C-alpha cells in the first residue's frame, strides 16, 4: 500500500475535507454577519452543497478503513461538489449576463418536508439578489471564487478516487 493510499484511508484526509468545508461555511457566515453581505438563493444552495461536502467528510471520518464508508463519503463528496459547481457557474452567468427574464426566486425551493429556510433562518434564509455583486477580491467575484472552490474539490476528488477506493474491504485484525 502506497503512502498516498494510506493517507486516503486515514481519518486525517477526511478531516482535511471536513475542515475545508467548515472554513468555507465560517467564511460565508463572516461575509453575511460581519461584512453585512446578504446571501441570495443561489448562495444558499451553494452553502447547502458545502454542507454536503462537510457531511461526506464526517462520514469518511467515522471508519475510513472500511471501503463501504469511503464509497459513501466519496459519493457525497462527488454529488455535493458537482452540484455546487453547477450552481456557482449558473450564478456567475446570472451576474455576468443579467436579464429580467433570468432571475432567482426570493425563497429557496426546499422540499415541504424539509424547509431549511424556516428551521435555520440564520443560515439558510436568503436576503440578497442573485445579480448583485457586492464583493470582489483581486477582481474575482464571490461566485467566481466558489467556482474555484468547487472545482478544487473535484480536482482533489479525481486525485484521490483511486487510492480511496482501493485496498481491502475491512482492516485486518492481525496486522
UniProtKB/Swiss-Prot annotation:
What keywords tag this UniProt record?
A: Cell inner membrane, Cell membrane, Chaperone, Disulfide bond, Electron transport, Membrane, Oxidoreductase, Redox-active center, Transmembrane, Transmembrane helix, Transport
Name the gene that codes for it: dsbB
Q: What is this protein called?
A: Disulfide bond formation protein B
Which source organism? Shewanella oneidensis (strain ATCC 700550 / JCM 31522 / CIP 106686 / LMG 19005 / NCIMB 14063 / MR-1)
Membrane disposition = Multi-pass membrane protein
Q: Which GO molecular function annotations are given, in alphabetical order?
A: electron transfer activity; protein-disulfide reductase activity
| Domain of life where this protein originates | Bacteria
The cellular location(s) given in this protein's UniProt record come to: Cell inner membrane
Any one of the GO BP annotations: protein folding
Record-annotated membrane-spanning stretches? 14-30, 49-64, 72-89, 145-163
Principal localisation: membrane
Q: Which residues lie on this side of the membrane: Cytoplasmic?
A: 1-13, 65-71, 164-175
Family according to the record: Belongs to the DsbB family.
What SUPFAM superfamilies does this protein map onto? DsbB-like
Q: Which cysteines are joined by disulfide bonds?
A: 40-43, 104-130
Topology check: give the Periplasmic ranges.
Answer: 31-48, 90-144
Function of this protein? Required for disulfide bond formation in some periplasmic proteins. Acts by oxidizing the DsbA protein.
Q: Which GO terms describe its cellular component?
A: plasma membrane
Amino acid at each position: 500500500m502506497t503512502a498516498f493510499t494510506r493517507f486516503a484511508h486515514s481519518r486525517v484526509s477526511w478531516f482535511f475535507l471536513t475542515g475545508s468545508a467548515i472554513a468555507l461555511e465560517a467564511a460565508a457566515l463572516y461575509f453575511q454577519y460581519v461584512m453585512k453581505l446578504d446571501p441570495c438563493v443561489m448562495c444558499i444552495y451553494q452553502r447547502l452543497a458545502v454542507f454536503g461536502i462537510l457531511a461526506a467528510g464526517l462520514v469518511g471520518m467515522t471508519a475510513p478503513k472500511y471501503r463501504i464508508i469511503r464509497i459513501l463519503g466519496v459519493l457525497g463528496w462527488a454529488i455535493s461538489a458537482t452540484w455546487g459547481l453547477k450552481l456557482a457557474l449558473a450564478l456567475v452567468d446570472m451576474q455576468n449576463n443579467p436579464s429580467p427574464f433570468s432571475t432567482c426566486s426570493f425563497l429557496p425551493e426546499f422540499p415541504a418536508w424539509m424547509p431549511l429556510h424556516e428551521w435555520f433562518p440564520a443560515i439558510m434564509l436568503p436576503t440578497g439578489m442573485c445579480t448583485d455583486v457586492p464583493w470582489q477580491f483581486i477582481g474575482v467575484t464571490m461566485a467566481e471564487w466558489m467556482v474555484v472552490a468547487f472545482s478544487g474539490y473535484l480536482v482533489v476528488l479525481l486525485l484521490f478516487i483511486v487510492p480511496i477506493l482501493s485496498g481491502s474491504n475491512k482492516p485486518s485484525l492481525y496486522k
